[in-house]
């Protein structure tokens, strides 16, 4: 058979989470027999049930007439109105409904948006460049690759407080022989996956100023904007910055704050011309979101029940995060420099006895049944670290610590 997939689609890697899930499944029976049934700290997905209010609203919508037909790919009016209100109430951002487009999850939105703005070519010198954080969400680089572009890393390190020096990035890009005129967009993600780090409003102002100066689009992935522990670290929207709407689009998700990752619903908002052009692209790719999901999402977004659920969920994550940091430092002697202020992620250095993060994760899985993700899956600046997702129960976290201590997985173990 002739080669079917083009150079871009044919060269993408399997998503790291699927690789880990597959390996864990292969070892499950063996681990369970020896009292080490797998405990996953790998997937970035809440394991709690969504709010009852949301489930009830969905059931109610299922019986409404007209709910089972095609929906508007831009989003039904009731959803767009709810998003408009949410952006104003949560961030103080004035958005018109024609500056919003619904998404089948923010992952789909970002992938299709990149497909729309990148001009694909196999000529390395001519490829459009997207600036991305490093470490960052593992799919960003592959999304760009499959769209026919190339990514360029903006290092997030403890030294720069996970807010890269943009002028330094720009200078390094040119030192590396790349053409700055080919930079199409900058993609940022705060609070950050995998680090759990947030940025300041002042930094967002610098980002907007930088993008305007160099005439590049700002894409802000705000999937974790409602997952934070303290009011002083409450995440901002990039659209709060004066003039940001001139060259910014921001992606939001219902998945994380309401524990509805499988529902696949989110939105993008920002510059009207850009969002409307993207909506045209979307209309050729999909037929929108199932209406009952939109109806329920619209109801939860600005409800007392929804806000109370977010507060409760964040308090639960904070309890687990506090336990995790205390147990790993005091019982397992770990050195933790980065203590997250948001999300359900922890970012740990790999014990010195291991050559790399993959070796450590494999040993931990095979001996203790504990599943973590190698940091270099999120970029070259993730080398030497692992990402831990504390979405399991507190009791399971306690079992993780017990197993690791019993099996010799302390930070300074020989």
Question: Where are each of the predicted segments found?
Answer:
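N-terminal small-domain helix-loop-helix segment of the aminotransferase-like
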Residues: 3-105, 112, 300-303, 411-414
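Conserved core of the PLP fold type I
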Residues: 63-210, 226-227, 233-241, 245, ...
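PLP-dependent enzyme catalytic core of the Aspartate aminotransferase-like
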Residues: 85, 89, 174, 354, ...
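Active-site PLP attachment segment
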Residues: 240-277, 289, 384
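Structural signature of PLP-dependent enzymes
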Residues: 278-285, 301-325, 357
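Conserved glycine-rich beta-strand-loop-beta hairpin in the small C-terminal domain of fold type I
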Residues: 294, 298, 314-325, 336-350
């Amino acid at each position: 058979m002739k080669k079917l997939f083009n150079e871009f689609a044919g060269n993408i890697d399997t998503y790291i989470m699927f690789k880990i899930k597959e390996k864990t499944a292969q070892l499950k029976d063996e681990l369970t027999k020896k009292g080490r049934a797998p405990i996953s700290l790998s997937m970035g997905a809440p394991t709690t049930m969504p709010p009852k209010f949301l489930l009830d609203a969905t059931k109610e919508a299922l019986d409404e007439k007209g709910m089972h037909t095609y929906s508007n790919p831009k989003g039904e009016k009731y959803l767009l109105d709810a998003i408009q209100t949410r952006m104003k109430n949560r961030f103080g951002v004035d958005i018109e409904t024609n500056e919003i487009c619904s998404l089948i999850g923010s992952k789909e939105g970002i992938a299709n948006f990149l497909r729309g703005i990148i001009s694909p070519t196999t000529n390395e010198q001519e490829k459009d460049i997207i600036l991305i954080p490093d470490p960052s969400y593992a799919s960003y680089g592959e999304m760009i690759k499959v769209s026919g572009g190339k990514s360029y890393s903006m290092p997030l390190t403890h030294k720069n407080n996970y807010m890269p020096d943009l002028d330094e990035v720009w200078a390094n890009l040119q030192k590396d022989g790349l053409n700055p005129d080919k930079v199409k967009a900058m993609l940022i993600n705060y609070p950050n996956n995998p680090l759990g780090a947030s940025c300041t409003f002042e930094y967002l102002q610098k980002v907007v100023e930088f993008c305007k100066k160099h005439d590049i689009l700002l894409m802000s992935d705000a999937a974790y904007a409602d997952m934070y522990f303290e009011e002083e670290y409450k995440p901002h929207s990039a659209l709060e910055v004066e003039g940001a709407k001139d060259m910014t689009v921001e992606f939001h998700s219902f998945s994380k704050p309401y524990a509805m990752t499988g529902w696949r619903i989110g939105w993008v908002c920002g510059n009207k011309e850009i969002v409307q052009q993207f909506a045209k692209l979307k209309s050729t790719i999909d037929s929108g979101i199932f209406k009952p999901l939109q109806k329920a999402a619209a109801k939860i977004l600005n409800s007392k029940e929804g806000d109370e659920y977010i507060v409760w969920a964040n308090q639960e994550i904070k309890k687990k995060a506090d336990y995790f940091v205390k147990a790993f430092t005091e019982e397992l002697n770990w050195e933790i420099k980065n203590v997250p202020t948001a999300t359900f992620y922890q970012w740990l250095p790999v014990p010195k006895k291991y050559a790399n993060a993959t070796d450590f994760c494999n040993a931990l899985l095979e001996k203790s049944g504990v599943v973590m993700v190698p940091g270099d899956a999120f970029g070259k600046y993730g080398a030497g670290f692992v990402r831990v997702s504390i979405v399991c129960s507190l009791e399971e976290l306690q079992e993780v610590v017990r197993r690791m201590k019993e099996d010799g997985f302390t930070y300074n173990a020989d």
